[in-house]
Design a protein with these regions (language model features):
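Substrate-binding and catalytic surfaces of secreted/luminal carbohydrate-active proteins
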Residues: 158, 162-174, 185-415, 426, ...
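Residue-level detector of functionally pivotal "anchor" positions at catalytic/ligand-binding pockets or at interdomain
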Residues: 553-567, 649-654, 845-880
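Beta-strand-rich modules
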Residues: 617-638
């Protein structure tokens, strides 16, 4: 499953996870996704201090391509470009051993003209243009048989710098690279000794190089970088390498060495955002892009210079890396993933936001998001140079629906007109009345680009399903004002688009080739207005660039529905149940639930698309007061004003938090709706300990529990288990955590003993039973944590205890909470059966555990009349019922019999 496929299948995952439910249950488990195991976890917090790692970014004109420069400017922004790489040529002998030839001067002028598109006063590094290494590019005057003439080579470099200083004094030459990829002998430049001698001559015999740096050999294979750096000391002070071959270890270690030496870490030919992330992590200060792809690189350059890195992770075995950055000016956050251009392998990353619900490219609310990076099978085999960026959004105004694959109308904000394909030479905007039926030319199929499309795959294709023609920027233009037409260029880069959420349900739509914005041409007409691409507009003109993706049957209108009313919040043992009165508008499609801290700060969208007038918030933390409000959203994605706000908090009593009885369902039977989700259809067996059925796990399945189910100072986890794969060690009965550095788990066997372990980044703290968990028969097991003591219980008897466990579950704040699965990739899944799994927010006593074990139905004993009225009462569907209700109900988070 690739990240693109993730976009397509998220809804399917959610649907399959919810499939066992017998009714619509509006709680956080609607959004809980049971992601498969990932190789690397990337935890981050949007509120973290983070690390600022600014980089001097640049573009390359050694490969002279004006389109690359224009793309780089549009995506990176001129303000973020501080350097460029140009080239001197060895193709002709110097005139009189001192002066550049006309052809050499012409190429410097052409390259400088391209640099001038960025700025007329940009710093420049001059690099050797070796071409293909033939005599056409390297004249024997300079080198022959891979042996250089250092004196002539030095004179050539000096003459090239002198020409630039004379003709372009505003461009400062700050460094020179005597050879390009010198470790690749077919280039026929010269030896390491030749390189050092050239550098020595420049520094000792040419005064103009007193303040111009010499870069070390920019090796093709980074395994050779240290040799071509150490071998040119002390004359070369800029460490430099490419990453077209070589190990991850030597790449990282090279940058660390340059930094440790007090020299300048410089990469003059970057090919992938993954390579850039890794180099930045280990110290690179200046990076120049060879060629230029588009979005991921541009956004990484922008945010790295204006923001803070919140997380970084790498997979050296697959030559990939990932990171999360926050723009400190706008608050926007982005996740990046990339790898080696020629050596990356398939890899998986799980981005984890333990303390806040977020949205990844509009998917959410989520605390965890898994993506798959598409690598190759060997060096330059199956490689696509893949890279990807995700928008991470949160707050009061997030995407109102995820933009998944499907058919849409695209409505402009300013005119409420629709994008329409007319003929084969123009795309225009037509205006319709709000209820008009769209024509075939008004419908667009949105699909994520293939992750193997080549390079950056952070895009969509936008296609008219009737004609098969795509939104296409005419002639691959990178200029503002270029027409957008219906065409079929086989999903080329000028037919790929990406979205940026702009608020109020509207998006910017930007082109991969140009980075410019889909826009209505300025026109007083209200229909048949041509659509173009444009730079970002301002003021009232901005509406011409704002678009909304509407369902085909939705009206084209922007009138907000009436707000919901009567919002109430009922405290429960580990949740707040919200109820409200529906909006009076008939076309209201769903509701959005927002929550803030008690002081009114930090509003966030904790649920959206709710097709009911109630919601159970079980992502609230114990003992914490919140403010809530609800918004109505209609079919056209217009949002109402919010309801009046209320204040609420979960209850403070010692009570049950969740109960999973597995009677044909993995739903929680408490009022907290801590419903589990499964990556496959759950299986049940009649060999049960409590009730008629138990959850059957065959070593391939597992359950994921809601994010906040284990976030407590004290707790009890109690369950019945029948363990059948007893030949395997390190299976899990439960494992709550955030990866392999934060967890608490119970394993039936570590090889010799049943063990409870808890870890919060430091040393693991454990409690062992004297033996393994008994196999092939039902037994009750519990872990109690509280009062400074952790105890393991088996069939109501304490079998292990410790007062030396100082870590509390709330210290970990676990969100990856599993039954039958480990945080560790290599640990086997549990095989056997589970029944009557319960979690309490306090440590049960031995007497309470024995009472629990003796309840064969999993239902509490009938309560006295006076205790009945103390707390609200709910039926098993979660709806509140009157005190006169008879039968099995839920009160204070547990089942009770009402007589």
């Amino acid at each position: 499953m690739t990240s693109c496929k993730t976009l397509l299948t998220l809804g399917l995952l959610l649907a399959s996870a919810a499939a066992p439910a017998q009714e619509y249950r509006p709680g956080s488990s609607l959004f809980l996704t049971p992601w498969p195991v990932a190789q690397v976890t990337v935890p981050f917090s949007l509120s973290a201090t983070g690390t600022q790692l600014p980089v001097r970014w640049g573009l390359d004109v050694a490969w002279l391509n004006e389109q690359n420069i224009r793309k780089g400017i549009n995506f990176i922004g001129r303000e973020n470009l501080g350097i460029a790489r140009s080239s001197f040529q060895m193709n002709e002998p110097l005139v009189g051993d001192t002066t550049l030839t006309k052809a050499q001067q012409t190429m410097l002028r052409r390259r400088t003209a391209a640099i001038n598109l960025i700025s007329h006063s940009l710093d420049i590094v001059l690099n050797a243009d070796q071409g293909d290494g033939s005599s056409q590019y390297i004249n024997s005057y300079y080198s022959s048989g891979n042996r250089a003439n250092p004196e002539r080579w030095a004179r050539l470099i000096d003459a090239s710098v002198a020409y630039m200083q004379e003709k372009y004094p505003a461009h400062k030459v700050v460094a020179v690279s005597p050879f390009n990829e010198p470790d690749y002998t077919p280039w026929n430049e010269g030896t390491l000794a030749n390189f050092k001698e050239i550098a020595k001559l420049l520094k000792e015999n040419y005064p103009r190089f007193e303040n111009i740096a010499i870069t070390a050999g920019n090796t093709l294979n980074n395994d050779h970088a240290a040799n071509w750096y150490n071998g040119v000391k002390p004359y070369a002070t800029w460490g430099n390498t490419h990453q077209l071959a070589g190990s991850f270890n030597s790449f990282a270690n090279f940058w660390k060495q340059v930094v440790d030496d007090g020299n300048y870490p410089y990469a003059d030919e970057l090919h992938n955002v993954g390579e850039a992330m890794i180099a930045v992590h280990y110290g690179m200060k200046t990076g120049i892009w060879w060629g230029f792809d588009s979005r991921a690189r541009g956004e990484f350059c922008r945010i790295s210079n204006h923001g803070t890195r919140l997380a970084y992770a790498e997979n050296r075995a697959t030559w990939t890396a990932a990171s999360v950055y926050r723009d400190d000016a706008t608050g926007q956050a982005k996740a990046f993933v990339g790898g080696s251009e020629r050596q990356a392998n398939n890899s998986t990353y799980l981005f984890l936001s333990p303390d806040r619900d977020v949205y990844f490219d509009g998917q959410g609310p989520l605390r965890a998001f898994r993506m798959e990076y598409p690598g190759g099978t060997g060096y330059q085999t199956g490689q696509t140079n893949a890279e990807r960026v995700y928008n991470i959004t949160s707050g009061e105004d997030v995407e109102r629906k995820p933009l998944t694959a499907g058919e849409y109308k695209i409505m402009n904000k300013g005119t409420q007109g629709l994008v329409a394909a007319l003929g084969t030479d123009d795309i225009v905007q037509n205006c319709y009345t709000p209820t008009a039926t769209p024509r075939k030319q008004d419908i667009w199929a949105i699909a994520p680009a293939s992750d193997r499309i080549g390079g950056d795959y952070s895009f969509y294709t936008i296609t008219n399903p009737t004609t098969g023609l795509h939104l296409n920027v005419l002639n691959n233009s990178t200029e503002s004002g270029a027409n957008v037409i219906p065409y079929n260029a086989q999903n080329a880069s000028n037919e790929q688009w990406y979205t940026e959420y702009a608020g109020d349900g509207f998006y910017f739509i930007r082109n991969r080739e140009s980075g410019l914005y889909l826009s209505l041409r300025a026109n007083r007409k209200v229909s048949n207005i041509s659509i173009v691409q444009s730079s970002l507009l301002t003021g009232a003109n901005l509406d011409r660039q704002l678009w909304r993706f509407l369902p085909i049957d939705a009206p084209t209108e922007t009138t907000a529905p009436a707000a919901p009313t009567g919002l109430t919040g009922t405290p429960q043992s580990a949740s707040v149940r919200l109820n409200w009165t529906a909006s009076t508008d008939a076309d209201v499609d769903s509701y959005t639930v927002l929550r803030a801290d008690a002081d009114g700060n930090g509003w966030n969208t904790i649920a959206r698309g709710i097709a009911a007038t109630s919601y159970t918030d079980n992502t609230c933390r114990p003992g914490t007061t919140y403010i809530y409000k609800v918004v109505a959203v209609d079919k056209s994605l217009n949002a109402s004003e919010p309801s009046t706000t209320i204040q609420a908090r979960p209850g403070n009593d010692k009570d049950m938090v969740a109960s999973w009885q597995f009677e044909g369902s993995i739903n929680d039977e408490s009022a907290n709706m801590m419903d589990a989700v499964s990556p496959e259809a759950p299986a049940y067996q009649t060999d049960a300990k409590v009730g008629a059925q138990a959850l059957a796990l065959n070593g391939t399945g597992w359950l994921q529990l809601p994010y906040e189910v284990g976030d407590m100072d004290e707790m009890t986890i109690a369950l019945w288990a029948k363990w059948t794969n007893n030949s395997k060690s390190w299976t899990r009965l439960f494992d709550f955590g955030n990866g392999t550095t934060q967890y608490m788990f119970l394993t039936p066997s570590n090889g010799t003993n049943m063990r409870f372990a808890i870890k919060d980044g430091g040393d693991e703290q454990t409690v062992d039973a004297p033996t393994k968990f008994p196999a092939n028969s039902w037994h009750h097991v519990a872990v109690t944590l509280g009062g400074g003591t952790v105890t393991l219980w088996l069939d109501g008897q304490a079998v292990g205890s410790s007062t030396g466990v100082t870590i509390k579950p709330s210290d970990i704040h676990p969100v990856l909470n599993y039954l039958g699965r480990s945080q560790f990739r290599t640990d086997p899944l549990f095989a056997g059966a589970l029944d009557d799994v319960r979690i309490y927010n306090h440590a049960l006593s031995q007497e309470q555990l024995r009472d629990l074990i003796s309840q064969p139905t999993g239902i509490a004993s009938p309560e006295a009349e006076e205790s009945r009225k103390a707390e609200p009462l709910y039926n098993l569907g979660g709806s509140r019922v009157p005190e006169s209700y008879k039968g099995v109900a839920v009160q204070k988070g547990r089942k009770v019999v009402r007589r």
